């Protein structure tokens, strides 16, 4: 089980925005991470969550942009030579498209410009001709039993988040 706590910088911790600090809570693969978010992302999580048993749980409306940002950030850091687990990058990518299958057909909230840019950049990284779609499709088939059309799923994300069409 993994628990992630989201916060804004309190000014007392010297971390880069978006930096993740894992904290192992048990020897049996449980972990706890505290993630410092940019204000726009923090506000998104606060506004778009589901309360279950008194706990606010981020929903697809906030998780998709967060996962897209994590993919962009970790891909950038990997390209700059940083040691990044490629499985985590692939998981963020697949999570975006898996969560997109749960979005309603009606448009969602208007995102702040910073987040709109990030989600658009993420979608532009997966044109329908991308060789990654084979792996994405296999991942979705294994986890949710669904096959996806790249054009349809990227268009659904763009429509829900009110983004310009991507190709």
Regions found by a protein language model. Give the residues of each.
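Compositionally biased terminal segments of proteins
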Residues: 1-167
């Amino acid at each position: 089980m993994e628990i992630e706590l989201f916060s804004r910088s309190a000014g007392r911790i010297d971390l880069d925005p978006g930096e993740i600090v894992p904290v192992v809570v048990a020897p049996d693969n449980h972990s706890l991470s505290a993630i410092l978010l940019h204000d726009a992302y923090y506000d998104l999580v606060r506004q778009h969550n589901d309360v279950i048993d008194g706990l606010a749980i981020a929903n697809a409306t906030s998780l998709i942009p967060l996962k897209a940002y994590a993919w962009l950030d970790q891909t950038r850091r990997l390209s700059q030579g940083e040691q990044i687990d490629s499985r985590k990058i692939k998981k963020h990518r697949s999570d975006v498209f898996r969560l997109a299958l749960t979005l309603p057909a009606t448009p969602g909230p208007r995102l702040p410009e910073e987040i709109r840019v990030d989600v658009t950049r993420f979608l532009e990284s997966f044109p329908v001709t991308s060789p990654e779609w084979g792996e994405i499709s296999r991942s979705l088939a294994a986890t949710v039993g669904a096959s996806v059309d790249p054009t349809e799923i990227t268009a659904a994300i763009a429509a829900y988040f009110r983004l310009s069409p991507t190709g």
